[in-house]
Regions:
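Blade/loop signatures of beta-propeller domains
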Residues: 13-38
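Beta-strand-rich domains and repeat architectures in extracellular enzymes and scaffolds
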Residues: 22, 42-71
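A short beta-strand motif characteristic of beta-propeller blades
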Residues: 40-46, 82-89, 124-130, 167-178, ...
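Beta-rich, blade/repeat-based domains predominating
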Residues: 48-60, 91-106, 132-147, 178-195, ...
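Short loop/turn segments immediately following the C-termini of beta-strands
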Residues: 60, 68, 111, 152, ...
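Residue position within the beta-strands of beta-propeller blades
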Residues: 64-67, 107-109, 148-150, 197-199, ...
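Short loop/turn segments that connect beta-strands within beta-propeller blades
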Residues: 77-81, 119-124, 160-164, 210-214, ...
């Protein structure tokens, strides 16, 4: 048994520093890490219903899956449980997305009912936290508790700040291919610098919006400045611990990964299907702490677990440190 310690080193210059904790996993991988070519089915139609959308794996490796048909959230405390440990019900109508915070609160898009609702773990009650005009196909809560909603039908991403003010942070509300526009945004991810990544479904690209910038940079897919990889209707975007992109490329029924050598297909690379080496219309993905990938496989009505091929493909445990200053903080891990 090993004790793993994360240490941040810095020189004090009348600035202050904050350790950031995440509710999700951002493992770090060695160059050209691989995942098993055959996945295993973690949850089937009995628990995820038809066409599962959102999934969230927290830092304790608890797994949260939305059933859009019943409006329920199924929770597995760990992958070894065959059946959900807990099921949460509420007045949810066709919910599409969810996000779980470090204290176990759950934000959920309430679909046809329109508001974003929050399930409070402490007293197991529901409250509405964000009024919206269109359902959220992606939800995210950043390290300052700001809430983001990607509106597929409104072609924009809204941000509700912790002071209850809501602003548009990406897109104009009118669909288009320009750098300040979106066409049917879906998955979103906000990094430690509060930079926003958007899976721009209709424009076949991943856009990066730097903090307080309304023009995005195409970092993958159609229109990227550097040759990256061709995407077709991307729906999911997550970052690993080295800020490398992992993309659910729904229209191509595959998952794309990246590292220092660029982009590559890591699963579902031979087309659509229902066998364990294929996906059909995948929607969202989430890492566990070991670097395994969980993905909602919509047309197959299942959630698949794609295991990292070798433990040695993972560098070391996550150590997330955030600085209020612009200075870089080196950090190390020791076994």
């Amino acid at each position: 048994m090993f004790l793993r310690i994360c240490i941040g080193l810095f020189i004090y210059q009348q600035q202050y520093f904050t350790f950031a904790t995440f509710s999700f996993n951002q493992p770090r991988f060695r160059i050209n890490a691989t995942w098993n070519s055959n996945a295993t089915t973690f949850a089937n139609l009995s628990f995820v219903g038809t066409e599962p959308y959102s999934i969230f794996v927290n830092s304790n490796n608890s797994i949260y899956i939305l059933d859009i048909n019943t409006g329920q959230i199924h929770i597995w405390l760990n992958e070894n449980h065959l059946n959900p440990t807990k099921t949460i019900s509420g007045n949810l109508s066709y919910p599409l997305s969810l996000f779980v915070t470090t204290n176990g609160d759950i934000y959920v898009d309430n679909g046809n009912n329109r508001p974003v609702d929050k399930w409070i773990r402490e007293n197991e009650t529901w409250i509405s936290v964000m009024n919206i005009t269109s359902r959220c196909y992606g939800l995210f809560v950043d390290i300052y508790d700001n809430l983001y909603c990607s509106m597929y039908h409104n072609h924009r991403v809204d941000k509700k700040w912790s002071n209850d003010i809501t602003t548009i942070v990406a897109g104009t509300g009118v669909q288009g291919p320009q750098s300040d526009m979106l066409q049917n945004p879906v998955g979103i991810f906000v990094d430690i610098n509060l930079d926003l990544y958007v899976a721009d479904f209709g424009n076949h690209r991943i856009l990066l919006f730097r903090l307080n910038q309304r023009h995005g940079i195409t970092v993958a897919g159609y229109g990227s400045a550097n040759v990256t990889i061709e995407l077709f209707h991307p729906t999911g975007i997550v970052l690993d611990g080295d800020q490398h992109l992992f993309i659910v490329d729904q229209g191509n029924d595959r998952i794309i990964g990246s590292d220092e050598n660029g982009f590559r297909c890591i699963f579902g690379c031979s087309g659509s299907g229902s066998t364990n080496d294929k996906l059909s219309y995948p929607y969202a993905m989430s890492f566990d702490s070991y670097g395994n990938i969980y993905v909602t496989d919509q047309d197959n009505n299942r959630v698949q677990k794609i295991s990292l091929s070798k433990k040695s493909d993972r560098k070391y445990e996550n150590c997330s440190i955030f600085s209020k200053s612009t200075a870089k903080i080196p950090f190390f891990t020791f076994d």
